[in-house]
Amino acid sequence: MKSCDMRIEGRIVRVRSTEQSVGIINMKELRGGTIMIAEKMKPFVQNNSAIRMMFEEGNRLRAKYGADKVYDFSLGNPSVPAPDCVREAIIDLVNNEEPTVLHGYMNNAGFEDVRETIAQSLNRRFGTAFSAHNLIMTVGAASGLNVILKTILNPDEEVIVFAPYFLEYGAYVRNYDGKLVEISPNTETFQPNLKELEEKINANTRAVIVNTPHNPTGVVYSEETIKELAAILEKKQEEFGSVIYLISDEPYRELAYDGVEVPYLTKYYKNTVVGYSYSKSLSLPGERIGYLVIPDELEDSSTVITAAAIANRVLGSVNAPSLMQKVIQKCVDAEVDVAAYDRNRLALYNGLKECGFECIKPQGAFYLFVKSPVADEKQFCEAGKKYNILMVPGSSFSCPGYVRLAYCVSYDTIQNSLPEFKKLAAEFGLN
């Protein structure tokens, strides 16, 4: 643990930091109001991400016991290296492209030739009819979601999400003074609870966010589910005389198993915006590169496209990283070795089932969502630490009673963890 002094509003404040966190501000001082940060930021500081905190706990345990004796399933950080074409593309571009072009500004939407290459790839794969103007290159999917929410959301309008969900969605919606509305989980299948959705959509609903393949459950929404969802949204648009956007967050699209197909949502509902990231499909999470798709069929699409490009700029991104845009152009149809994740998926799923744990077999992404053997899943997570097993509580995804395990780890980590999971299961009367 390192420490440093920060000057905040004329005061010197001691801040502790690790490699993974830039600082932990004293909570007593924060509550007392002596640190002058925005009111909107105080809840984020007070409730720092459980996932990140668990990752830091993993660092502590690794330092104490050794990396091979710690089973850290907390963070969805890809463990499979990027395809060779990524390295080759970077070398080729740096050696052969004009530097002022390669590293320079471009249209806020991104290089036109890059966007056209991606559009044609999507058209080949999904039978769509996109062109360059339908795409906006973004600083990953997270930035893309902020861009589209900035573009469409007015203060106090509602955005609906299906629990369990990535909790940062709430932060993104509140960035633009919107209101997040949760739909309770369908814990039998973890397909969206469409009955409750239909009840909660109202005249103030601006958008619905979906994520498939799904974090944290690994479920892929079926075509039947997507068709039913689209029908509900169409009906509600007509009922309220307003546009309801469907925002599809797709960082895990390429990670699907057992031949499962992931429906491409613009084909089912015209007012769909797709947010994509190469963080998982090419193992490039730190490079922050992705895109938005805004189809021509979307209501007033040309205005939305123009506004989204401007939002990309005014939110501070200006444009997506220029070098990585060109890398993506050269690697547009490449993907990571999904077979490695599949091997991990089967080993961990089968191993946990043999220990007596309950969970749905994931169809995509790289997560298992396991039912806690006790009502308070945080108690279960704490018990896991005794065996150097790190899991994320389901309450971090607005779904208490479950824990998430990210199996984007080494195969040896999974194999070595299973005897410890067996001990953990025995502690709770399983097996």
Functional labels for PLM-detected ranges:
Residues 8-9, 19:
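Short, basic, low-complexity termini and linkers enriched in Ser/Thr/Gly/Pro
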Residues 98:
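Alpha-helical substrate-binding/gating segment
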Residues 57:
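Short beta-strand-loop-alpha-helix junction that forms the active-site gateway
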Residues 101-102:
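Pre-Walker A segment
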Residues 5, 12, 23-54, 62-94, ...:
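PLP-dependent class I/II
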